[in-house]
């Protein structure tokens, strides 16, 4: 048994009165809050406001979470659909099971439609959120640590993960395939959640650095394309290490196929935007005009309400 290892938490939830608080949910919420802060900071530099981000977040985040959950359930049908699963399990989000690919897909679509509705330039919105997404994902991965899930193959490395719950072993591909499960008391596993955390944080730093360094050369939307390429590439090799149950298609795990597609789409998007993408400065001017119009209408509405209240007092 290795003397050096990463321990697993001894709890995944706690009670406050009649309420049960799950660490998985807390990690996701913290990740969302940090992402909104990063997004707001970058959006304001383009000429936007916090209120615009707040409205967009309130519309987009719930849809993205639903998309993340549904993608996970659809790609691991044995746990959620008859005859082996139970549809009620789809609602048990506190037990884990939020697939980022589903969140990215649905969240991007909803954000695009919302930006069109509000006349916000979507390309610079995508750039603004590009480094925020991997940071949120990195924080969210801590929830997998608390749930003792999404670990990798057995290892003897000094940063191997030590499980403290026999049920955690049952989440591995080894047990699903009928092979004898390793003894969780003497076996360490690759902490793939940690690998993805580090990969995502490096990616966020690179996007911010390259976005600043190449500001005069990048087209609007290319920073988001960088995110797709980076995450797709990283998830491809991480999926090779993970041993949680997954549907296999043509010898590859479902998430590996999705990661490859995301990487390829990111490459195509980067090249297309390089040739035909909009100018970030022009998009920023467009956003500034929309913001000015919104603020003017807001000021007029506030003045109307003020006069209405004043009229009531004089009666």
From Swiss-Prot:
Functional pathway: Protein modification; lipoprotein biosynthesis (diacylglyceryl transfer)
Source organism superkingdom: Bacteria
One Pfam family named in its UniProt record: LGT
Family matches, as InterPro entries: Lgt (IPR001640)
EC number: 2.5.1.145
Membrane topology: Multi-pass membrane protein
Cell compartments where the protein resides: Cell membrane
Gene Ontology CC terms: plasma membrane
Predominant cellular place of this UniProt entry's protein: membrane
GO BP terms: lipoprotein biosynthetic process
Keywords: Cell membrane, Membrane, Transferase, Transmembrane, Transmembrane helix
GO molecular function, one term: phosphatidylglycerol-prolipoprotein diacylglyceryl transferase activity
Recorded family membership: Belongs to the Lgt family.
Protein name in UniProt: Phosphatidylglycerol--prolipoprotein diacylglyceryl transferase
Native organism taxonomy: Bacteria, Bacillati, Actinomycetota, Actinomycetes, Bifidobacteriales
Purpose of the protein: Catalyzes the transfer of the diacylglyceryl group from phosphatidylglycerol to the sulfhydryl group of the N-terminal cysteine of a prolipoprotein, the first step in the formation of mature lipoproteins.
Binding-site residues for a 1,2-diacyl-sn-glycero-3-phospho-(1'-sn-glycerol), renumbered to this chain: 141
Spans through the membrane: 19-39, 93-113, 188-208, 256-276
């Amino acid at each position: 048994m290795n003397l050096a290892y990463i321990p697993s938490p001894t709890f995944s939830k706690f009670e406050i009165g009649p309420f049960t608080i799950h660490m998985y949910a807390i990690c996701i919420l913290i990740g969302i809050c940090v992402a909104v802060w990063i997004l707001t900071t970058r959006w304001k530099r383009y000429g936007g406001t916090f209120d615009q981000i707040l409205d967009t977040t309130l519309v987009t985040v719930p849809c993205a979470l639903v998309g993340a959950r549904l993608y996970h359930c659809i790609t691991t049908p044995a746990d959620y659909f008859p005859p082996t699963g139970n549809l009620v399990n789809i609602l048990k989000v506190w037990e884990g099971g939020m697939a980022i690919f589903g969140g990215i897909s649905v969240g991007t679509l909803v954000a695009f439609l919302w930006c069109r509705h509000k006349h916000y330039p979507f390309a610079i919105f995508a750039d603004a959120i590009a480094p925020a997404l991997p940071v949120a994902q990195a924080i969210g991965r801590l929830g997998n640590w608390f749930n003792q899930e999404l670990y990798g193959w057995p290892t003897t490395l000094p940063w191997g993960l030590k499980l403290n719950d026999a049920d955690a072993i049952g989440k591995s591909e080894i047990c699903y395939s009928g092979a004898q499960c390793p003894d969780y008391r003497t076996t360490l596993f690759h902490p793939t959640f940690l690998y993805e955390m580090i990969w995502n944080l490096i990616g966020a730093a690179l996007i911010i650095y390259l976005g600043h360094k190449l500001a005069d050369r990048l087209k609007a939307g290319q920073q988001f394309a960088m995110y797709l390429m980076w995450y797709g590439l990283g998830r491809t090799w991480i999926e090779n290490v993970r041993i949680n149950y997954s549907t296999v298609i043509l010898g590859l795990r479902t998430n590996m196929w999705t990661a490859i597609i995301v990487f390829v789409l990111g490459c195509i998007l980067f090249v297309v935007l390089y040739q035909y993408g909009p100018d970030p400065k022009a998009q920023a001017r467009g956003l500034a005009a929309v913001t000015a119009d919104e603020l003017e209408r807001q000021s007029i509405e506030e003045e109307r309400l003020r006069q209405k209240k004043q009229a009531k007092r004089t009666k």
